[in-house]
Amino acid sequence: MKFLLLFMTLVFAAPSSAADKILFVLTSHNKMGSLDMKTGFWLGELTHPYYVLADAGFRVDVASIDGGMAPIDPKSLDFSDENNARFINDKKLMASIINTKAIEDVNSEDYQAVVYAGGHGTMWDFSNNELINKLTVSIYERGGIVSAICHGPAALTDVKLSNGQYLVKGRKLAAFTNEEESNVGLTEVVPFSLQDTLMSKGAKHIYGAAWTVNVVNDRRVITGQNPQSARKVGKEILTELKGIK
């Protein structure tokens, strides 16, 4: 009898399968438009929030648009950054990037939060992506968290909720700015202006000075303006997840 009571206590006290799982989604695109230049995801926009969340005990999976090895933007390989340096010796995370899940194979019900890491590659394969749209809506409408960093909000440009409205409509968010795109000389290279496109869908674009930390949390949509904002995004997700749990 005591064994039965203990068993039932453990079963009913166990959290749901999604309660402590977070999904990071990376780009699979590695070419910078018409330029002879490689791109991909920005390493720090994965490592900074990843370690905040993993160190807090959350289970983290990594997916990409096509699956397999996700391309890292060569310009983001700064190993003087402590989180990037940690990544070099992190066999688990390294393996996750080498062999990402394809987004079509992801079960959205497994996750309490999704994080769209940035990098210029996202401008080619995150926007107008039906698989991303379905994943985002599923997690958000179950009460989960949607997050995106820098160019990662390209994933949010076409997401419509079940009521037919854009997720970003009337919502405050941060994203890579036109000024920052101009600073890196890629305004005419990227396929669209992220800032202008989000605003055209009704988003209230909240921006800080170029290359400074700026994170916005509006009703479980957590966004960061640039690579400098990545760690704070992780902390904001952590705070929000603790509130949900």
Pin down the residues of each PLM region.
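Extended, subdomain-level signal for the structured scaffold at the beginning of enzyme domains
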Residues: 19-142, 146, 154-245
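Positively charged n-region of N-terminal signal peptides that target proteins for export
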Residues: 1-4
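N-terminal signal peptide c-region/cleavage motif recognized by signal peptidases
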Residues: 13-15
